[in-house]
Amino acid sequence: MFELNNFDALQIGLASPEKIREWSRGEVKKPETINYRTLKPERDGLFCERIFGPMKDWECHCGKYKRIRYKGIVCDRCGVEVTKAKVRRERMGHIELAAPVSHIWYFKGIPSRMGLILDMSPRALEKVLYFASYVVLDPKETPLLKKQLLNEKEYRESIDKYGDDSFVAAMGAEAVKTLLDEIDLEQSSIELKEELKTSTGQKKIRIIRRLEVVESFRKSGNRPDWMVIDVIPVIPPDLRPMVQLDGGRFATSDLNDLYRRVINRNNRLKKLLDLGAPDIIVRNEKRMLQEAVDALIDNGRRGRPVTGPGNRPLKSLSDMLKGKQGRFRQNLLGKRVDYSGRSVIVVGPELKMYQCGLPKEMALELFKPFVMKKLVQNGLAHNIKSAKRMVERVQPQVWDVLEEVISDHPVLLNRAPTLHRLGIQAFQPVLVEGRAIKLHPLVCTAYNADFDGDQMAVHVPLSVEAQAEARFLMLAAHNILKPSDGKPVSVPTQDMVLGSYYLTMDKDGVKGEGKVFSCPEEVLMAYQCKAVDIHAKIKVRLKKVIDGETIERIIETTPGKIIFNESIPQDLGYIDRTVPENKLKLEVDFLVSKKTLGGIINRCYMKHGATKTSIMLDKIKAKGYHYSTIGAITISTSDMVVPEAKRELLQNTEKQVEKIQKMYRRGFISEEERYEKVIDLWTKTTEDVANALMGSLDSFNPIYMMADSGARGSKSQIKQLAGMRGLMANPSGKIIELPIKASFREGLDVLEYFISTHGARKGNADTALKTADSGYLTRRLVDVSQDVIVRQEDCGTEEGYEVSEIKEGNEVIEPLVERLSGRYPSEDIIHPTTGEVIVKRNTYMNEDIAKKVSDAGIKKVKIRSVFTCKSKHGVCARCYGMNMATSQKIHIGEAVGIVAAQSIGEPGTQLTMRTFHTGGVAGADITQGLPRVEELFEARKPKGLAIVSEVSGTVKMEETKKKRTIIVVTDDGEEVSYDIPFGSRIKVKNGDIISAGDEITEGSINPHDILRIKGVDGVKNYLLSEVQKVYRLQGVDINDKHLEVVIRQMTRKIKIEDSGDTELLPGTMIDVFDFEEANREILEKGGEPAVGRIALLGITKAALATDSFLSAASFQETTRVLTDAAIKGKIDPLLGLKENVIIGKLIPAGTGMTRYRSIQINTDDENIEEDSMDSIEV
């Protein structure tokens, strides 16, 4: 039985005229739409009820048959079938054309498919199709050539010269159709393959492109002459509706106008042909028909687009699919859903971490069907209808039922933009008064939400499965770690940090200092009776039973620390409990700041799991808010103390600057040096003022406390408040040498204020641009990696990928421990001195083991990596390693591709947009920040290219007046010389030994050069460390494996150089695994294998080169992708996420995987009874 949504693959192809007639329910003969008086569709028109079905349910056009009892009857008067009006969304019609026309996609696309298969230039083809030239179809005995073009004059002359029937020439799509009909694909294929063996250069490229099209037609069973259309399908009328506006006017879809033009011209052409009109008139009419059909299929592709009122181009069928507003992205990938609402958010500090406050009226509307069902169940309403009435009238008993319904029904909260998967989380709703959603303060970081008017959307998971997944996988209390680097995301911020910081401070000489208390409870009592200050250094006797023996100790602490430690588990490993005197010490015996809080949460999560951590977080939150209120930490101008030393420092610097100016005026130093020196001086002074300021601030100064605890603000901001603002940059990024000497406390003068606004304005403009760029980068990353899912446990590869720490200059950017933890080594790791095996191959390394390896002094380790994974689709769990979001091993079915794309894209907005200008005129600008990441992922030739050595050897430098040359001498004495342009900085010294692919000058390397010199492993390594450098320098941690996933997708295709005995075509791109498989088969038969080179594709190209045409078409260049796919008769295997979302199937990841869907649960009654008996005995 054929089920509509139960299929494994989807094929696309060209539609033959027979197929189009088969789809159709009748021919549309008239351009009329709806009768303006009766408002009923005209017969045989574009909205005809006989063809497309009735406008009203169960009612024919003339009204003879009304009601459902006549279902399926075709009215004998008007010929309309009595059925649902919904069929007008699926029934198609057709238009029989009086003359064939070409399909513009196949004629005009790049490369022109029609041109390639006919071996005619698109220009020549255009002349024929649009009736400007004749093409010779059959030269017979004449010296004319087949497919030769003749203009009107030449045609006349040829006829005069050779006689009327001596040759056949024609124009228009009919001529092209005849030519296409004559093509013998098998023969063409053989001939082209023969030609390919001997040809070179441009000719070879052309033959390869022709061969590709010929092979596509040959293998797919599409016929070339189907690229010329005899019949045009008319899409169902409800997909191109016509609606009446209030003024009696009609609003209609543009498609109706385009169809009308086609029908009008077609009917006129029929009439002219019947009348036997002169050739020139008929020809003109055919050309107009061709243009009308072009406009219908793809308006604006050729010539000027057809415009509607107000000079707006009409939206053609292609435009309906293309772009953000097209069918793919607007309706198939982003649908609006029912059971959803949105409202403003307010903070809910009293909530538990898994709760959110839902406004009553919103909850009632969202859970309406559930409430109605419950009302009937509880006997408060007799039937669903009366229950609905009760809900709509909001009768008092409804509220109790609503409470009951939502008690264990999670809801999903989402804040746009959803940059990573923590942008949607599940919560247990709590009904609140008012109309605002209440959000727990600790999930704000994940959502990037604040309460200045942000709005959030609520969605209700309906099915039991959806509710279970929401509760177990998406509950906010479970999402404590960031998927990008495995660090906690639910870290207390602002007031909570400030309260905890205040609580754990100590102060000398306050009330109660030095007192000794008998137990913690007594301390709290004394604090509540105001007998002891919260920061007083006191001693407390603690008692605890450990392993059956009671231990007593007196410890030194403060009341605040005792209060704070109540909410912290006392086994997080901050204190070495093996030492007897430490047995009862408080776990957190230090000043708590935002950073240390993150550490506490991380340790708690690793030790006790999510549930306990979320309970601890709630306690910290409550205490933090309470004590930041009690501490009454406020901010005032008197807290901003301008340091005494400032005036003196400024005067000294001004004197030195004057000295430098003098030297410049006397010509001792150049303009460049003067500028550099002045900048250096002022930078140092700003630092000195800042240090003087920090030294003069009291540790209980509120502003200092806020910055030091990490609650709000930073040292640099304090510096601006009370020190000096320092140097500013102008909009182009150059530093202005006049510093701002004032601080905000003293106030800026006019010039200083003006200079300040420069930078601020630039910052705002940058941010706006950056958001869009970052969003687009994320979209491309998602598209390139969306089908990477963990599909198997172990791919069984023996290969490994060698990792060492990543350095920039002398600074370690990513240490070895970070690159090793959560991975499997691909070979035994042996201690360099003792020779013992630290880790066996294929054993999981957690952070402790990774530390052990690093401490043993090992510098390079081979690990299992996504790069070397042999899974054909997706990756295997061993090569991927640890799931960063849970710090457990990854499960099969995890959509690691999407997670990777989100982890790289989400911090995109934090990266800078700047291009750094190096001093000096010819110095290359090094791109950094977001543009650099984009440049790497798109595998573009970078700005500021470095010169790279092609060979390994020793460096020899030669410098003449005209140029500098570096010569690399290889081991066998061969010399390769490189000319160095002036202004670029040389990285190597005389006598250095360098290897192939090393930089000679500073700058960025073209990744394609690295691929050529160092091979595919070299380029993978380069891309990985370069992207990491950009992110790490901005203080963003991303785990390597996310980058590996994307880079692997960029290096998956092989460009075929020689096809050997395989079916593969030279010059085409093919997946690495398909390539290996094809070669394996040929070798088994004893043939010659194909030869190919790995190609490095940018993410846009890689996303378009995917096997799935649905995914590619919904990404970019929709028409090109579909044209190509149709000719090849491509089959989409529906392996990725996007394709399945588009056709409305469950995604093949997580619980949507077949292995989870096909689990059978046995429920034999006997077994259940026995089981229950057993459990009772226990």
Curated annotation (Swiss-Prot):
Catalytic activity from the UniProt record: RNA(n) + a ribonucleoside 5'-triphosphate = RNA(n+1) + diphosphate
Stretch forming the signal peptide: none
GO MF annotation terms: DNA binding; DNA-directed RNA polymerase activity; magnesium ion binding; zinc ion binding
Catalytic class of the enzyme: transferase
Residues the entry annotates as binding Zn(2+) 2: 795, 869, 876, 879
Family according to the record: Belongs to the RNA polymerase beta' chain family.
Function: DNA-dependent RNA polymerase catalyzes the transcription of DNA into RNA using the four ribonucleoside triphosphates as substrates.
Protein name: DNA-directed RNA polymerase subunit beta'
Native source organism of the sequence: Clostridium botulinum (strain Okra / Type B1)
Source taxonomy: Bacteria, Bacillati, Bacillota, Clostridia, Eubacteriales
